[in-house]
Swiss-Prot record:
Keywords: Magnesium, Manganese, Menaquinone biosynthesis, Metal-binding, Thiamine pyrophosphate, Transferase. The keyword Cell inner membrane does not apply. Its cofactor is Mg(2+); Mn(2+); thiamine diphosphate. The lineage of its organism: Bacteria, Bacillati, Actinomycetota, Actinomycetes, Micrococcales. The gene is menD. It comes from Leifsonia xyli subsp. xyli (strain CTCB07). SUPFAM superfamilies: Thiamin diphosphate-binding fold (THDP-binding). This is 2-succinyl-5-enolpyruvyl-6-hydroxy-3-cyclohexene-1-carboxylate synthase. GO terms for biological process: menaquinone biosynthetic process.
Amino acid sequence: MPDARAADEPAQRLPRTGNPATDYALALLAHLIGAGVRDIVVSPGSRSQALALAAAELERAGAVRLHVRLDERVGGFLALGIGRETGAPAAVVTTSGTATANLHPAVLEAHESGVPLIVITADRPPELRGIRSSQTTHQDGLYGVAVRLAKDVPAPSGEEEDVATAARLAVESVRAAVGAETADPGPVHLNLAFREPLSVAVPPLPVVERGALPALAGAQKLGRETVVPGIGPSTVVIAGADAGPEAEEYARSAGFPLLAEVSSGSRFGPNLVVAYRELLREPEFGGRVRRAVVFGHPTLSREVPALLLRDDVETVVVAPRGRQAYNPGRRAVIVGAVRPAVEADPRSPEARAWVGLWVSASRRLVEAAERVASPDATAPDLAKARSLDPSDALAFARMELAAVRAPITRPLLAEALWRHTWPHDRLVLGASRLIRDADRIVPGKRLRVHSNRGLAGIDGTIATAIGVALASQAVAVETGTLPGITRVLLGDLALLHDAGALLGGSGEAWPNVQVIVGNDGGGTIFDGLEVATIASPAAFDRVLYTPQRGDIAALSTAYGWAHRVVRTKGELDQALSAPPAGASVLEVPLER
């Protein structure tokens, strides 16, 4: 922990207004910035006005990026998206009352995903609590075990010690959010009481120093060591959500097949097995596995937990951060890191045969699935294209035209989106049926993929994507690198559930973000569950499939987003290859 006196010094350089709320708010936010915070999200409110006005002046001074959102739930997920992309906590500021509860979904997702986040809620002072004061509820401890640090901060009194206390609290909060001492990053809750007068005008600010983020503590803080699994028995590497490139590197260097989910950040490399679900069900593949090394949080299949529940499969879970680790059988060995055995040789005949068995079988299955999904698709006949015979040229043109006019299916949509996304872009996948379609077919490609798989809810998907877009594109501008586009793939229900995220203030900057919605008229993800076979059609449609009356085109226009409907493969490819142009919605009608 930094020395308290060092934390006090910048506070003395801030202007003093004589208003306790304003002076405290300035000190707290300035020191959050000094500890590594780069983004503040504000929702309007009276009790939090000192924080909001201080944030505006800090943005004017060039110290921070400010984002204003009317809906606190949207603001929470926006901050979550920023934290996902940067690894730095964004601070989200709300007033008291129900505003604080609207942050709870984002807090829970940040908790389960290990995303740093700082929640700052304004509150009444003690004398106004418990007497039915307006817009007052019990906010202390509101988020329970989901936060890494919770502080109920007394109302500042205007004493000199107030700003020093705020400075220390800011440093402590950032360190808790990033897991500097615990290796357990996640949300922090600061509940700040303010007495009237709630603010005064903020004078011009001096230069506010922007500090570096503290480093994440090592896995040894969790008592997890680095282990070296041997070269046998028959081993696979499983990469779930947020596993990152480390899973691919280990699988390749150790000579093991890589079963990587589309949201893992590990879905690339020569050892990748795309059709892992089908192969895990087969005795000659899944039945031969005797050890699994797991990275990240697998959530997209039933076959993976079924494998790890088997008594004859040894499970090693790599969890360098977070108190909880994925452990469906409750008997996995939880470690901080893995290294290939010294004797491991990925080029050995045994390793090549084991990996090759999985990779080649996966390739055959994917090709077969593509033929089923697009039975009319054929490879271009280049001989006809080069032929001088007019009939050959005409036949080739007809084939190409048929391919362009092909209707869009879910696999085709997922494949096209994946193909048109580049490493400098960002891809956000919602908790809809489409993420599973993508997981079944898209090939290896090193992309930055985000998905809220901590709790896998459909809420907040668009807001998260906008946060990812704002953060990634701001960093690109600052570093002089090529800014990409952020695309989010989701279903119609997920879009309608987060429709408020499409709303932005007239003074807010909007990034290049494209929302691609597969509109199949409801929750078709339930069609593949057991409930579809036992419920009556009428009851199933009403309470699970839940078709909505929403008009996505009208909704997009009302909120100022460009909207386009695409129905064919050619239209889809054209829309995805067009240069980024602000905020847009691409609606793709799909059959149920």
